Amino acid sequence: MPYPDREQVRLDFNAAKKALRAAGVPPKLIISIETKALRTGRKLTGEHVTNRQSRWTISPTNPQYASECDARVIFIILCGMMFEFDNAPALPQEAKSLFESYLGKSIEPGTYRDALLLEKLDYYRLRDDALNPQHGYSIYHIGHQDPTRARRHVPNNVAWRTSRSNLIQGNMTLREARIYLIKLIGRYFELGELDIK
């Protein structure tokens, strides 16, 4: 999907943050989403050491790299997806139109599901997690359809996922993880470990 140029994305990024505040989204949650979208994770060992740097300031060979424009688009997309969670606050039409233009579809409250486990995600849980964080843990993560993709932090490869879903997927593509789960369930039945009677 084509997105606006960098200057327009910056304007829309600021408009999105203003819309979030107007919808009653707590500042700590806005900062949390901004950190996930714009900054690298903490990786203090190994080949690609990072610690919350702006994604566009690190080497493009780093798996956590994203252009500034892509990182800001991802922020807008993640926020738009959040308004499809159960219990998400209502959005005024003007703000809704902004988020929908980046999502490429209409926002339908209460319809968002984790792409692997198909569990519904809940705004209150996301909000509470941001307001009362536990070091090293968050209930919802940014997931990647293909975590092995050379440039993985791009708008069409990013979505909200549960922490468990991210753990199960690991370094598999979403499709590979789904097939793996089906095979796993099949083995349980084959070995008599499950019976649905």
What are these regions (language model features)?
Residues 115-160:
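Histidine-centered nuclease catalytic patch
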Residues 3, 65, 102, 112, ...:
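Sequence-level detector for tyrosine residue identity
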